[in-house]
From Swiss-Prot:
Remaining remarks: This organism lacks a tRNA synthetase for tRNA(Gln). Instead, tRNA(Gln) is first charged with Glu, and then the bound glutamate is converted to glutamine by GatCAB.
UniProt xrefs under SUPFAM superfamilies: An anticodon-binding domain of class I aminoacyl-tRNA synthetases, Nucleotidylyl transferase
UniProt-recorded name of the protein: Glutamate--tRNA ligase
Coarse class of the protein's main subcellular location: cytoplasm
Domain of life: Bacteria
Top EC class for this record: ligase
Family: Belongs to the class-I aminoacyl-tRNA synthetase family. Glutamate--tRNA ligase type 1 subfamily.
Length: 485
């Protein structure tokens, strides 16, 4: 049998990292088994579903490299199929019309709460007579449709992640609403548990891989599979992604959508790699840096943890840093140019390309995210700098003015500054000031960049020298040094 899995996001928001991680596990399992990965958009929430969210979901999956084999299918196009299934359940006597009002149901919940009982529907309209139904209709009530759940029914399945799972029918909240209110003889808008099962049957889904927050839906869905004459698929409920405090990661935690991570400068392969590690342990010898294709070769449910996976920003940044360092120089520059343009930095992409290339190579080793190149690169796109407190302190050292005066006087006029020339100037300036080379380099860095920490000093000096910006910066720093020393 060909393995068929599906991702079924709701377009009520941008692609969430939890949904994306579910997509990763589905994709890995499908590729591992030579199966099919199906994309289905669950857009039955008419009030909250938006086309722009659908577009965001599709773009996010494609950016991550999670290509699908079928779809996207849209549930809003399949309403007739769901209504046929509901009619089948009505005809079999497995579903019925319920005329309870919202006020009656709220009163029932309040009564149960007062008694310390779990809220559940008491199935009071399961056996209405035709006369009782007619009376409710005459009173202007429109019924929902409920699916019968027997309290004494035990539902079990062998979860591919969690092992044997068992639920009692009495714990499922009573008979389940499967269609919204509509006049009798009509079938209202179908609801989640019903449409999911109908689609999974129609699409031949063999394995349902989803987050553990869906585990309470599974027994209800198993009953629906059986009622519709279908064999339930395999189920795998993966651990939730947790925040730093051990709670489920949510929008309140800030960055949670794939488009947010992308905007922050995380690379798609790095993010996909990290999401794979959120709950899955690679076998020995694979390491923590791997492609999706490599992970697919080794993927198994046995290596998925049952406990929640805590989101670790340091780990993500470390992974992203490795992937940034692996980028080819031209590929890396292509990533940075749009960011620099978006930041408003002035340059001519064609004329300045060699200079931009050198700048990109200077920054590449020190970046955790691509977006850090905006701040770290800023000092190279402006003719002058502002000295931070540490730079001011360095320029205030007794010999800084002597160092800067020597460098200014002997600065080469030609546009090319070689490493040898720069090193010689630093050594000579140190000798003239009677200080060590390290102190001279700290003073030079403070003058050129406005800070005492940063990327390779010689490469930074060469880049600034190409634009002729080292001379005015040295002059400004000398003036500052003479004022404070």
């Amino acid at each position: 049998m060909t393995v068929r899995v599906r991702l079924a996001p709701s377009p009520t928001g941008n692609l969430h990292i939890g949904t994306a991680r579910t997509a990763v596990f589905n994709w890995l399992y499908a590729r591992h088994r030579g199966g099919k990965f199906i994309l289905r958009i669950e857009d039955t929430d008419r009030e909250r579903s938006r086309p722009e969210y659908t577009e965001n979901i599709l773009e996010g999956l494609q950016w991550l490299g999670l290509t699908w084999d079928e779809g996207p299918y849209f549930q809003s196009d399949r309403l007739d199929l769901y209504r046929q299934a509901i009619q089948t359940l009505l005809d079999k006597g497995l579903a019925y019309y319920c005329y309870c009002t919202p006020e009656e149901l709220e009163a029932l919940r309040a009564e149960q709460k007062a008694k310390g009982q779990a809220p559940r529907y008491d199935n009071r309209h399961r056996h209405l007579t035709p006369e009782e139904q007619a009376a409710f209709e005459a009173a202007g009530r429109t019924p929902v449709i409920r699916f019968k759940i027997e309290d004494d029914r035990q539902i079990e399945w062998q979860d591919l992640v969690r092992g044997r799972v068992s639920w009692q029918g009495a714990d499922l909240g009573g008979d389940m609403v499967i269609a919204r209110a509509a006049p009798r003889g009509e079938i209202g808008y179908p609801l989640y548990n019903l449409v999911v099962v109908v689609d999974d049957i129609a699409m031949g889904i063999t394995d349902v891989i989803r987050g553990e927050d869906h585990i309470g839906n599974t027994p209800k869905q198993i009953l629906l599979y059986e009622a519709l004459g279908a064999t339930p698929p395999n189920f795998a409920h993966t651990p939730l992604i947790l925040n730093s405090t051990g709670q489920k990661l949510s929008k309140r935690d800030g960055v949670t959508s794939i488009s947010d991570f992308r905007a922050m400068g995380y690379l798609a392969p790095a993010l996909a790699n990290y999401m794979t590690l959120l709950g899955w342990s690679p076998p020995e010898g694979v390491g923590e840096l791997f492609t999706l294709d490599l992970a697919a070769k080794h993927f198994s449910f046995e290596r998925i943890n049952k406990a929640g996976a805590r989101f670790d920003w340091d780990k993500l940044n470390w992974l992203n840093r490795q992937y940034i360092q692996q980028l080819e120089p031209e590929e890396f520059l292509a990533e940075l140019i749009p960011l620099w343009q978006g930041a408003g930095y002035a340059f001519d992409e064609e004329r300045d390309r060699p200079w931009l290339f050198d700048l990109a190579q200077l920054l590449q080793p020190g970046l955790n995210t691509l977006r850090e190149a905006i701040d770290q690169g800023a000092v190279f796109f402006i003719p002058s700098v502002t000295f931070d407190s540490e730079a001011m302190a360095q320029l205030g050292q007794p010999q800084s003015a002597t160092i800067l005066a020597y460098l200014l006087e002997h600065l080469p006029a030609e546009p090319a500054l070689t490493v040898a020339m720069g090193q010689q100037l630093i050594q000579q300036a140190a000798k003239a000031a009677g200080v060590k080379k390290g102190a001279t380099m700290r003073t030079l860095r403070a003058a050129l960049t406005g800070a005492v920490h940063g990327p390779d000093l010689m490469a930074a000096w060469q880049i600034l020298h190409q634009r002729g910006w080292d001379e005015p910066r040295l002059a400004a720093a000398l003036k500052q040094a003479q004022t404070t020393s």
